């Protein structure tokens, strides 16, 4: 793919118009444009790139994707099959926020008793208006971790998403739920054929850029469920929908956060999902991910254990069929003494589906007495199915258990 095509995907005017439509502060515009500048300079990954091994990205023509505009229509409640199923299993909820790009509507509900206690569960766009200074620090601060063309694309073009903040010493037993329902048909744009004065309709795939920021303050406890799904549509045949998502978790000292993430999409969806968690002193993150369907899922789950007593437990379940492809990359980065991580992935594949799991345990020189474990087991239920496992260790300390 040519650089010119990649550049056409994000024009500077597109980023500036997004800021103008949303009425965003100058600092956010500067941050978006910085992401756009870096995006143009960053090479496109290929199937030979280490973190993208076996993922088919070479044929993804970014110039044929159009970013979906922010959802403006608010409604009281949205009924979706995936959401209804989740509610049946979860029971009562602390709050629900749904972005339905298929209908161009969104729905937000939260227990008022929680907001009275200082809990923030709000669309990211709304939160920017009410908590601009706090979000500025979270969004603009440069942090360690993976950064490539897709993370920079999300930085420049994220349209909405969720901000969840739990005050210190607050325990919330009921779960919060955030769901994104992807567009189901290609977008038509009027273009002029070369040498003709008439316009013709050209179909483009669509791109969605959700962003989640979760902050758990000292000694708080919260349960969070995030789902991304889509419905099949004949109108979408042959047109890829790109979902480029980012989830950022901040756990202060003593915080306890449980996250369940479900991805269940149609065969025309390519999901790139980046999860990054910063885990403080004596804080615990339980993260469960379920990859249940898509054309391709490329997910990176990065846990950075920043202080003694930090614990990260990551569990993954992948169920593949047809010609679906799943690529999961976990990174447990131990940067302090006395930290613990436990990563377990289970994969079952039918038909011609494929998966690759890459697990990296990093132990910095200072991170003595690290206790870390990772396991990936695969069940192949079809003669054409294939699963690869690539565990890695990068250990600089000498008193560890891995």
Please place each PLM-identified region on the residue numbering.
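N-terminal amphipathic, basic helical "cap/leader" segment at the start of enzyme domains
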Residues: 2-152, 344-350
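Conserved beta-strand/loop scaffold segments within soluble protein domains that form the structured core
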Residues: 109, 115-402
């Amino acid at each position: 793919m040519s650089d010119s095509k990649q550049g056409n995907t994000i024009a500077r005017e597109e980023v500036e118009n997004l800021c103008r439509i949303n009425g965003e502060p100058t600092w956010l515009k500067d941050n978006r444009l910085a992401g756009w500048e870096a995006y143009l300079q960053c090479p496109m990954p290929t199937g030979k790139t280490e973190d993208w091994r076996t993922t088919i990205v070479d044929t993804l023509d970014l110039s044929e994707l159009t970013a979906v505009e922010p959802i403006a229509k608010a409604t009281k409640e949205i009924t979706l099959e995936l959401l209804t199923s989740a509610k049946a299993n979860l029971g009562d909820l602390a709050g629900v926020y749904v972005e339905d790009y298929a209908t161009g509507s969104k729905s937000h509900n939260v227990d008022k008793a929680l907001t009275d206690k200082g809990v923030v569960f709000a669309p990211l766009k709304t939160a920017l208006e009410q908590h601009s200074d706090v979000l500025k620090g979270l969004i603009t601060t440069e942090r360690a971790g993976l950064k490539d063309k897709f993370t920079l694309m999300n930085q420049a073009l994220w349209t909405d998403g969720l901000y969840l903040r739990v005050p210190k010493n607050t325990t919330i037993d009921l779960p919060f739920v955030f769901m994104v329902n992807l567009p189901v048909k290609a977008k038509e744009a009027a273009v002029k054929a070369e040498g003709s004065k008439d316009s013709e309709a050209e179909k483009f795939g669509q791109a969605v850029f959700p962003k989640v920021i979760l902050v758990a303050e000292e000694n708080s406890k919260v349960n969070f469920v995030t789902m991304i799904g889509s419905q099949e549509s004949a109108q979408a045949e042959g047109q890829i929908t790109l979902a480029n998502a980012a989830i950022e978790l901040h756990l202060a000292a003593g915080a306890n956060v449980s996250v369940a993430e479900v991805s269940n999409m149609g065969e025309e969806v390519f999901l790139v999902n980046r999860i990054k968690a910063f885990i403080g002193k004596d804080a615990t993150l339980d993260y469960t991910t379920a990859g249940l369907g898509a054309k391709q899922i490329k997910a990176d789950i990065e846990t950075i254990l920043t202080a003694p007593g930090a614990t990260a437990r990551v569990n993954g379940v992948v169920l593949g069929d047809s010609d679906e492809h799943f690529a999961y990359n976990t990174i447990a980065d131990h940067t302090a003494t006395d930290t613990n991580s436990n990563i377990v992935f289970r994969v079952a594949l039918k038909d011609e589906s494929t998966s690759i799991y890459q697990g990296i345990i990093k132990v910095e020189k200072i991170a003595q007495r690290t206790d870390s474990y990772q396991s990936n087991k695969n069940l192949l239920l079809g003669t054409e199915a294939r699963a690869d496992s690539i565990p890695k260790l990068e250990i600089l300390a000498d008193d560890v258990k891995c």
